[in-house]
């Protein structure tokens, strides 16, 4: 081998990447793939819990159960004195109650504070007798008997408490739209007086689909 061939061979050897560099590159690629997979799984998990245009308040569900839709009611409790109570029956629009035999599968309450809210409230849904006047004494007894789950909502510096929803499954009870007048939303203002501009309750009633008019209103 002459000198030029020896020099060329030396150059070729020098051009080869070092084994350590190749290993570091492969390791970085593998780490990137693992991170990408983790981010993909995280995005899927978060997407499953996001509201959607089809079902904006049943968080965690992209759509109603097959054959079902939902009707929303918004309640703003009036001023409630400290240690006192408020109750409101579930009154659906006439266009819905017309189909009173359609089954109801779920009721969800979502508690949203308004800017002035800095209190603690207890919220629940209860089936009440038609004769009940939802007096303070009657509501107090229903909160005390432990027969229904209660959402304790407190002031959160971030604006909205993470667990601000209650979901009731009525499918096993075969409840229907006509039964909804027998249910009431109950609120207990535990520590402070609740002002009229402090709290909003969004109530979603998931029920079997009802016929809709094919003619636009004029």
Swiss-Prot record:
MF GO annotations: RNA binding; structural molecule activity
Start-end of Basic residues biased regions: 11-21
Gene3D superfamilies in alphabetical order: Cucumovirus coat protein, subunit A
Record carries keyword Ribonucleoprotein: yes
Entry's Gene Ontology cellular component terms: ribonucleoprotein complex; T=3 icosahedral viral capsid; viral nucleocapsid
Free-text comment about domains: The N-terminal arginine-rich stretch does not seem to be the major RNA-binding region that allows formation of an infectious ribonucleoprotein complex.
Name of the protein described by the UniProt record: Capsid protein
């Amino acid at each position: 081998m002459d000198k030029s061939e020896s020099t060329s061979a030396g150059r070729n050897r020098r051009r080869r990447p070092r084994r350590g560099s190749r290993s570091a590159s492969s390791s970085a690629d593998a780490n990137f793939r693992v991170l990408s997979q983790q981010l993909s799984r995280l995005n899927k998990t978060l997407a499953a819990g996001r509201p959607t245009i089809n079902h904006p308040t049943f968080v965690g569900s992209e759509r109603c159960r097959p054959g079902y839709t939902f009707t929303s009611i918004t309640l703003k409790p009036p001023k409630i004195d400290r240690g006192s109570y408020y109750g409101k029956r579930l009154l659906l629009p006439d266009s819905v109650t017309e189909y009173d035999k359609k089954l109801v599968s779920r009721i969800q309450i979502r508690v949203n504070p308004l800017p002035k809210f800095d209190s603690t409230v207890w919220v629940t849904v209860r089936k009440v007798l038609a004769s009940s006047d939802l007096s303070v004494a009657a509501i107090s007894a229903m909160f005390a008997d432990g027969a229904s789950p209660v959402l304790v909502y407190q002031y959160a510096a971030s604006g909205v408490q993470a667990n601000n929803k209650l979901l009731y499954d009525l499918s096993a009870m075969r409840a229907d739209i006509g039964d909804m007048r027998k249910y009431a939303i109950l609120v207990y203002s535990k520590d402070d007086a609740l002002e009229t501009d402090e709290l909003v309750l969004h109530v979603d009633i998931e029920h079997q689909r009802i016929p809709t008019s094919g003619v636009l209103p004029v």
